[in-house]
Amino acid sequence: MEWIIWSYDRRTDLDGENRFTTESAFIAAAEALLRNAWRGFVSASLPDGTFVRDERALRALIAASPIGR
């Protein structure tokens, strides 16, 4: 979930320590990311060093995460 925070930290409600101040702000960011992930996706380098090469790899990453279950 760290990559959601990195991707949407400027579009959500944050406190001074780069944390979501409300659970709903975090959930809204995650939903927006998942909704928009497939539009023009080519590849991505995630903050943890993971490199996602295509849409299929991104879908597999999401399916394996707790949010994808």
Segments predicted by a language model, with ranges:
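Short, mixed-charge low-complexity intrinsically disordered segments
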Residues: 35-69
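A short, charged, amphipathic alpha-helix used as a generic interaction element across diverse proteins
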Residues: 21-42
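Surface-exposed loop/edge segments in extracytoplasmic proteins
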Residues: 13-17, 50-53
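Generic structural motif
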Residues: 8-10, 23, 49
